[in-house]
Each structure stands twice: as structure tokens, then as C-alpha cells.
């Protein structure tokens, strides 16, 4: 039995609030159970130096957690003077996943800057960030069309992107781990897919006990099922 009482193949309650903040071109509050993340997509004129005069735009992502998003308060990374390796890894993952969904040529020499800020953490913050950010990007692209930054017929969005965690908990494959499960899981895996059914990234780690090919296949099957439900629910 899972601590939450959910079935092994059951997502947490999923809720999305669009236009959660008023300044960003795209903004979303995404909630997977008690995990809550604000995702914004800001459109900035110009591109990084390595993209100048290429005719292509760029998309980049940042990720952070509020000090009391966790059970005990943690210091802001700005106060410590540097980002943790975990933060850098997560924001690179978010950026990679989202760039796979956007035709950068179609947005011209503009940059979409994604910010994912965790306001409450209960497991799955990186996967929630990817899903929420994809929604925010779609809203930002629509803003660009409505405000003459893109031709109304332009279609920079190649696909939508969603992500979910799966794992082995108490020797059983489970979907969408919360903090209690994630902390005690024998295996933790994150799966990122697009709305065309393609796999963008898989991150899987055994925690003290290896997992079999059969278990991997079961976890991947659960992830596909969960991501299909996410697309049907919020996209």
C-alpha cells in the first residue's frame, strides 16, 4: 500500500492555473498533489552571442526553490553565492526538454526565458516544472502572435511536453512518487515525452538495489500511461 493510498498506476490530483502572474507573457501555476510550481515564460528580444545573426531564437530555463518550500527551511542559493549541482542539473534538463518542442527558427532572434519556482515541494518538482513550463511557453507563443511579434500563421510549437516520475517502491513499480515514496524508493526514474508519443529523456537511478529490464519496462509503461493522462487533462 502506498502512503497516500493511491493505486500504483494513479497520478496525484493535477491542477493548472493559467495567467497566474500578470507580467510574464506566459505563466502557469501547476499542482501535482502538494507539489506546486510557478512556471513563467518571458519573451526577450535578442539572443545569446553564439546565436547572433543565425536567424534562430533561443530557449533557456532556470529553476529554484523557495526557502520554505521544503519541510525545513533552506537558505536561498543567492545567499550561499552559488547554485547547487542539483539545481544546475535540473535547469539543464528543463531547457533540453523544452527546446525539443520549439522550432527556434520560427520565433526569430528572440529568447524565451523559462523560470520554474517551486513554492511547495512534495516530490516530482522537476517533472512538474517541465509540464508547467510547456504550458507557459504555449501561452507565450500565443501572446507573441496576438501582439505582432509573430505572424498569426506561424507555428513554432512542434509539440507539447510533459514529464512524470516513476519508481520501485516496496518492490512494486509506482507512478508519480510523492516525497515519502521518493525518499524510500529502491529506484527513481523521470520520463519526459512529447505529445506525439516520442521520448525526449529518461533519467533512472537505482538506490542501493538494481532494477531488472522487466521492471524498467513496467516503469516506462506506467510513465507512458501517466503522461497520456496529463496530456488529456491539461493540454
Curated annotation (Swiss-Prot):
Keywords: Nucleotidyltransferase, RNA-binding, rRNA processing, Transferase, tRNA processing, tRNA-binding
InterPro entries the UniProt entry points to: ExoRNase_PH_dom1 (IPR001247), ExoRNase_PH_dom2 (IPR015847), ExoRNase_PH_dom2_sf (IPR036345), PNPase/RNase_PH_dom_sf (IPR027408), Ribosomal_Su5_D2-typ_SF (IPR020568), RNase_PH (IPR050080), RNase_PH_bac-type (IPR002381), RNase_PH_CS (IPR018336)
Domain of life assignment: Bacteria
EC assignment: 2.7.7.56
Binding-site list for phosphate: 86, 124-126
GO molecular function: 3'-5'-RNA exonuclease activity; tRNA binding; tRNA nucleotidyltransferase activity
Catalytic class of the enzyme: transferase
GO biological process, alphabetically ordered: rRNA catabolic process; rRNA processing; tRNA processing
PROSITE patterns named in the record: RIBONUCLEASE_PH
SUPFAM superfamilies named in the record: Ribonuclease PH domain 2-like, Ribosomal protein S5 domain 2-like
Catalysed reactions listed for this entry: tRNA(n+1) + phosphate = tRNA(n) + a ribonucleoside 5'-diphosphate
Function: Phosphorolytic 3'-5' exoribonuclease that plays an important role in tRNA 3'-end maturation. Removes nucleotide residues following the 3'-CCA terminus of tRNAs; can also add nucleotides to the ends of RNA molecules by using nucleoside diphosphates as substrates, but this may not be physiologically important. Probably plays a role in initiation of 16S rRNA degradation (leading to ribosome degradation) during starvation.
Subunit (UniProt): Homohexameric ring arranged as a trimer of dimers.
Family: Belongs to the RNase PH family.
HAMAP family, per the entry: RNase_PH (MF_00564)
Protein name from the UniProt record: Ribonuclease PH
Species lineage: Bacteria, Pseudomonadati, Pseudomonadota, Gammaproteobacteria, Thiotrichales
Amino acid at each position: 500500500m502506498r502512503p497516500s493510498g493511491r493505486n500504483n498506476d494513479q497520478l496525484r490530483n493535477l491542477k493548472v492555473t493559467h495567467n497566474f502572474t500578470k507580467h510574464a507573457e506566459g505563466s502557469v501555476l501547476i499542482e501535482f498533489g502538494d507539489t506546486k510550481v510557478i512556471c513563467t515564460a518571458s519573451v526577450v528580444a535578442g539572443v545569446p552571442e553564439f546565436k547572433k545573426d543565425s536567424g534562430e531564437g533561443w530557449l533557456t530555463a532556470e529553476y529554484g526553490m523557495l526557502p520554505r518550500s521544503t519541510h525545513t527551511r533552506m537558505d536561498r542559493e543567492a545567499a550561499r553565492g552559488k547554485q547547487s549541482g542539483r539545481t544546475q542539473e535540473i535547469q539543464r534538463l528543463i531547457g533540453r526538454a523544452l527546446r525539443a518542442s520549439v522550432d527556434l527558427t520560427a520565433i526569430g532572434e528572440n529568447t524565451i526565458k523559462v523560470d520554474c519556482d517551486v513554492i511547495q515541494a512534495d516530490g516530482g518538482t522537476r517533472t512538474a516544472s517541465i509540464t508547467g513550463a510547456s504550458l507557459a511557453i504555449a501561452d507565450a507563443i500565443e501572446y507573441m502572435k496576438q501582439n505582432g511579434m509573430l505572424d498569426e500563421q506561424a507555428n513554432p510549437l512542434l509539440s507539447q511536453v510533459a514529464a512524470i516520475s516513476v519508481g520501485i517502491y516496496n518492490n512494486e513499480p509506482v507512478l508519480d512518487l510523492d516525497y515519502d515514496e521518493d525518499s524510500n524508493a529502491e529506484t527513481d526514474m523521470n520520463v519526459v515525452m512529447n505529445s506525439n508519443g516520442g521520448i525526449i529523456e529518461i533519467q533512472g537511478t537505482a538506490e542501493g538495489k538494481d532494477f531488472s529490464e522487466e521492471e524498467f519496462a513496467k516503469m516506462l509503461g506506467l510513465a507512458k500511461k501517466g503522461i497520456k493522462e496529463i496530456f488529456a487533462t491539461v493540454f
